[in-house]
Amino acid sequence: NYMKPKLLYXSNGGH
């Protein structure tokens, strides 16, 4: 999920 908001980066590790 690289196109998703930065709020998800924390959970997805930037994926």
From Swiss-Prot:
Recite the UniProt keywords alphabetically: Angiogenesis, Cytoplasm, Developmental protein, Differentiation, Growth factor, Heparin-binding, Mitogen, Nucleus, Phosphoprotein, Secreted
Where are the bilayer-spanning segments? Answer: none
GO terms (molecular function) for this protein are:
fibroblast growth factor receptor binding; growth factor activity; heparin binding; integrin binding; S100 protein binding
- Name a GO CC annotation attached to this entry: extracellular region
Q: Which residues form a coiled coil?
A: none
Q: Which GO terms describe its biological process?
A: activation of protein kinase B activity; angiogenesis; branch elongation involved in ureteric bud branching; cell differentiation; cellular response to heat; fibroblast growth factor receptor signaling pathway; mesonephric epithelium development; positive regulation of angiogenesis
Give the record's PTM text.
Answer: In the nucleus, phosphorylated by PKC/PRKCD.
Subcellular locations according to the entry: Secreted; Cytoplasm; Cytoplasm, Cell cortex; Cytoplasm, Cytosol
Q: What does this protein do?
A: Plays an important role in the regulation of cell survival, cell division, angiogenesis, cell differentiation and cell migration. Functions as a potent mitogen in vitro. Acts as a ligand for FGFR1 and integrins. Binds to FGFR1 in the presence of heparin leading to FGFR1 dimerization and activation via sequential autophosphorylation on tyrosine residues which act as docking sites for interacting proteins, leading to the activation of several signaling cascades. Binds to integrin ITGAV:ITGB3.
Describe its partners and assembly state: Monomer. Homodimer. Interacts with FGFR1, FGFR2, FGFR3 and FGFR4. Affinity between fibroblast growth factors (FGFs) and their receptors is increased by heparan sulfate glycosaminoglycans that function as coreceptors. Found in a complex with FGFBP1, FGF1 and FGF2. Interacts with FGFBP1. Part of a Cu(2+)-dependent multiprotein aggregate containing FGF1, S100A13 and SYT1. Interacts with SYT1. Interacts with S100A13. Interacts with LRRC59. Interacts with CSNKA, CSNKB and FIBP. While binding with LRRC59, CSNKA and FIBP seem mutually exclusive, CSNKB and FIBP may cooperatively interact with FGF1.
User: What family does this chain come from, according to its entry?
Assistant: Belongs to the heparin-binding growth factors family.
Q: What is this protein called?
A: Fibroblast growth factor 1
Q: What is the lineage of its organism?
A: Eukaryota, Metazoa, Chordata, Craniata, Vertebrata
